[in-house]
């Protein structure tokens, strides 16, 4: 018949402080471990992961319909025809940087509908 975890806890609860210290010493010796507190890890690991709030929209490839992509880029960026054409032809290129997630997703949708390959970073 084995002793359950609850029985062990009840047994330890009934011990005096000196008996618990002796029990800890005996367990350290028996199992070859130390009951010393573990060294804290780096503080950066404890910090919460910060949610990204600014995104970049990058034109990866033009696709088959270059004219539609140029029109979409002009509408989204406010660039002139020549500037938009140069930007599209220099793909991969950043179209907009530091915009909200909703704006980035909307821009990505418009450009993909025009036939472009787009990435939100």
Swiss-Prot record:
Entry function: Forms part of the ribosomal stalk which helps the ribosome interact with GTP-bound translation factors. Is thus essential for accurate translation.
GO BP, sorted A to Z: translation
GO cellular component: cytosolic large ribosomal subunit
Subunit structure: Homodimer. Part of the ribosomal stalk of the 50S ribosomal subunit. Forms a multimeric L10(L12)X complex, where L10 forms an elongated spine to which 2 to 4 L12 dimers bind in a sequential fashion. Binds GTP-bound translation factors.
Keywords: Ribonucleoprotein, Ribosomal protein
Protein name listed in UniProt: Large ribosomal subunit protein bL12
InterPro entries: Ribosomal_bL12, Ribosomal_bL12_C, Ribosomal_bL12_C/ClpS-like, Ribosomal_bL12_oligo, Ribosomal_bL12_oligo_N_sf
Similarity section: Belongs to the bacterial ribosomal protein bL12 family.
Transit peptide as UniProt keyword: no
Organism encoding this protein: Erwinia tasmaniensis (strain DSM 17950 / CFBP 7177 / CIP 109463 / NCPPB 4357 / Et1/99)
Gene from which the chain derives: rplL
CDD domains associated with the record: Ribosomal_L7_L12
One GO molecular-function entry: mRNA binding
Pfam families found in the cross-reference section: Ribosomal_L12, Ribosomal_L12_N
